[in-house]
Amino acid sequence: MKRLLRITVLFSVTLLWWGEKGYAATPAMDAAEKETVSATVEAEADKKDPKSDKKSDEPKRKRNLGHLSGSFETNTIYYVEDSKTGAVVPHNSYGSNNFLKLDYQLGRFSAGVQLEYYPHPLVGTPMQGYEYVMEGFSINNLTEKYISWTDRNYSVTVGDFYEQFGSGLILRAWEDRALGFNNSLGGARVTFNIKDIVEGKVLYAFPRFNLGYLSTQIAGGDLSFSLSNAIGLLDHRLSLEGSIVNRHFKNLPSWYTEYRDDYDFDLSKNVISYSGRVNYEYRGLSAKFEYVGKSKDVYLDNMTGEEVFKRGDAQLFEIGYTGSNYAVMA
């Protein structure tokens, strides 16, 4: 299918709210006014605290109302027939995915929303086939919303967020608008840092699906121990890390419950994944190793077309070197 026109617009605007109201110092009295001041008033003035006079001459501190930033992005395509390939125009002659994002920050507090609008989802994106869900406009189009408090050694987030444990083999929640992909998590997350030696994350959330959430529950934790910081290695960075994620199904899938007698395995409502990692860095050299294990889960065997129920595991090893004008990764 030939795409005649593709419009991609990214518009960002940042508004800085100082909300500062300056208060001018009280002007000094002129000579005529000074002459009218009685000796009694002068005597009273002599008894005043000189510090209070100094404060009254200073302007009040300016008030900070925070920082507001926003962006708007639209990916719009108009489709035309292509006689060479035989491609025809879909039911809707155009597709359009639109995103409006606003973020507000005041000190350690932050909050944000993301509004999405799909009058006709783009062909070839994951939303295709779910037009009946995407089309139109309602409160469900407010897909991302969060509030967060970030302190020096901890943070708390409630709402929708993105997260990744390790390399992302057992947990990765991310967004790619060009691909039309978003599997953010809606729930709560807490992070902490103890003297740059121990860092951790814990979360409980529901994964996003279309404009809503799945009933599947995700609970997990990630912990990192910096051995180099603990023993005072300045040039080397060595850390030991681990993660665990539990995926809990509120209800077993219908394809299993309706045809239970056709399967020779008992599908569990809980699937646990875990990983252990070692990271090492020295100047330009870096090396990472991760092992991942997974409890029994079902997947479709592409060779036989049958459902298979078994444990899983994976290993990932990366090594690289970064020089002044080059980098090598394997």
Where are these regions (language model features)?
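A short acidic, glycine/proline-enriched capping/turn motif at secondary-structure boundaries
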Residues: 120, 154, 163-165
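Phosphate/ribose-recognition catalytic cores of enzymes acting on nucleotide-derived substrates
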Residues: 144
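Surface-exposed extracellular loop regions of Gram-negative outer-membrane beta-barrel proteins
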Residues: 162-169, 173, 330
